[in-house]
Amino acid sequence: MSDKEMNVESFNLDHTKVKAPYVRLAGIKTGDHGDAIHKYDLRICQPNKAHMEMPALHSLEHLMAELSRNHTDKMLDISPMGCQTGFYVTLINHDDYDDVLDLIDKTLNDVLVAKEVPACNEMQCGWAASHSLEGAQALARDLLAKRNEWNQVFA
């Protein structure tokens, strides 16, 4: 790891020191008009040890993106990490960490009872063939089983 500070926040995180699963505040940006954008690192898999398979990850993304908005109007985006170990959860004007944990908890519980993956068709999705509701539900179940660990980022 370089001693030089990098522009991308996660590139400055020592991935060998973290212990998934966890939720950490990765950054705050303030807009020109005072809005605060909070980006959270929702890490599901241990970096460089495990990763989510794409169909499960893809379905979990669709499910969380849709279902989280039933619990808050502050959600801007839920986006998967390219390394397939987690998601970035981005909210506007919402700085209550415990409430973010509750939001993720409620959303994952919604995933467990979902009957289908939202927007899982060629009109609404760029890779509609790559989905697994069962895989997404298994990820949600495993993550919820470790709910008491989410606030512990480092080993």
From Swiss-Prot:
UniProt-listed SUPFAM superfamilies: LuxS/MPP-like metallohydrolase
Name the needed cofactors.
Fe cation
Q: Which UniProt keywords apply?
A: Autoinducer synthesis, Iron, Lyase, Metal-binding, Quorum sensing
Signal sequence range? none
Against Pfam families, the record matches this protein to: LuxS (PF02664)
Q: Which residues bind Fe cation?
A: 58, 62, 125
Spell out the Gene3D superfamilies in the cross-references.
S-ribosylhomocysteinase (LuxS)
Q: Name one GO biological process term.
A: quorum sensing
Example GO molecular function term?
iron ion binding
The Enzyme Commission number assigned here is 4.4.1.21
Q: How is the cofactor bound?
A: Binds 1 Fe cation per subunit.
Its recorded reaction(s) are: S-(5-deoxy-D-ribos-5-yl)-L-homocysteine = (S)-4,5-dihydroxypentane-2,3-dione + L-homocysteine
Q: What job does this protein perform?
A: Involved in the synthesis of autoinducer 2 (AI-2) which is secreted by bacteria and is used to communicate both the cell density and the metabolic potential of the environment. The regulation of gene expression in response to changes in cell density is called quorum sensing. Catalyzes the transformation of S-ribosylhomocysteine (RHC) to homocysteine (HC) and 4,5-dihydroxy-2,3-pentadione (DPD).
Q: Which family does it belong to?
A: Belongs to the LuxS family.
Please describe the quaternary structure of this protein.
Homodimer.
Q: What protein name does the entry list?
A: S-ribosylhomocysteine lyase
